[in-house]
Amino acid sequence: MGIKEIIVEACSDDIITATEAINLFSIITESEVSKVDKDFKPKESMKLSSFQKIHITESIIEEYKSKYPDLKHVRCKDTDTYKCDGYMWLDGKNLVCHVGSCEYLDDKTKWIVSLEITKNYKGHGLSKQLIDYAVKNMECKYLSVDKSNKLAKMIYDEYGFKVYQEDKKMYYMTLDTNPVKS
């Protein structure tokens, strides 16, 4: 039985509340994902262009959210405040990675709001390619990253993003020399 199943069982047996389960799962997955491995050896390089790219729609993202729980935070619905855009790359029927953006209508800033590479495709050099795609093709210049996600922060730093603001939980980063958002 995996960690997720154990937490679900504990929840259903009223050992812990749903909120406690969510917090516990976040702590566990956060510690697995955000570590910077000093002895990391890259795997064989993969090219983003070798996978099938599809434009994200609300129905497509909802379909994949059921198969890939890590996508639960991905949104693809425009509002009065922002306009969403995004792409997924598939290897056959398997999700390789995705990037989502939002353009805020008030100041026209474009943000990377979600960027994920699925487990089997991590370590193959896709992160920089995905950021490149978001910056060059989607014109994103802003992002926020959780302070506990040290690996993502390191990747964004290496790409050239700079912190222009932070709070207790997040770094707000940009490629702009004079950030619009404050």
Show where each model-derived region lies:
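Conserved N-terminal entry element of GNAT/NAT acetyltransferase domains
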Residues: 8, 34-62, 73, 180-182
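Charged, low-complexity interaction regions
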Residues: 12-19
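Terminal substrate-recognition subdomain of acyl/acetyltransferases
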Residues: 41, 162, 167-182
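Acetyl-CoA-dependent GNAT
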Residues: 49-114, 118-119, 131
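Active-site acidic-Proline motif in GNAT/NAT acetyltransferases
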Residues: 118-120, 124, 147-148
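Conserved acetyl-CoA pyrophosphate-binding loop and the N-cap/start of the following alpha-helix
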Residues: 121, 125-133
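Conserved active-site alpha-helix within GNAT-family acetyltransferase domains
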Residues: 128, 148-166
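Conserved beta-strand-loop-alpha-helix junction that forms the acyl-donor binding cleft
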Residues: 143-154, 169-175
